[in-house]
Amino acid sequence: MAQENTLHCTRAICYSGYRDGQDPSGEILPTYGQVKQDLMILEGQWQSLRLYASDNHSDTIMNVIKSENLSFDVMLGAYITAEQNNPHCPWGGVYSDEQLAKNVEHNQVQIDRLISMANSYPDIVSCVSIGNEAAVGWTDHLVPTDRLITYSKQ
């Protein structure tokens, strides 16, 4: 990952690229060709992409950017799950102790993958994001702030 002290301001957009019948569960993901088609449309309009996860689909996106010599930089995310209950979440945020323990293990795998991908694409990844709305009071995937800080220091 590029080691700069400041973030630069660019035209940025969140990108997922999922089409009808595709979803982040990993069953059916966008192909290299579909991602390339999307990014060719976005190039010239946007300089930065935000990806919510460091998964197989994100790896395809990074591969397209690198292989096609596209000019995007990426904010790469780690999509983490609840490590504590949140009874204030309107759509449910209470889990068993067993599930929360599994989530902690899952989250560390996600952080490890984030680090690996950022190191694999140092000229593309400009910054990282740990969790998506994981610290707001209404979320169903609440993670304590001290854990987010611990993850960020890895």
Identify the meaning behind each predicted range:
Residues 1-4, 36, 51, 149-154:
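Substrate-binding and catalytic surfaces of secreted/luminal carbohydrate-active proteins
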Residues 1-37, 41:
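Boundary/entry segment of secreted carbohydrate-active catalytic domains
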Residues 16, 52, 131:
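Conserved residues at the C-terminal ends of beta-strands
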Residues 28-32, 54, 107:
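A conditional alpha-helix N-cap/helix-loop micro-motif detector
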Residues 33-57:
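Catalytic domains of carbohydrate-active enzymes, especially glycoside hydrolases
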Residues 60-154:
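Substrate-binding cleft of extracellular glycoside hydrolase catalytic domains
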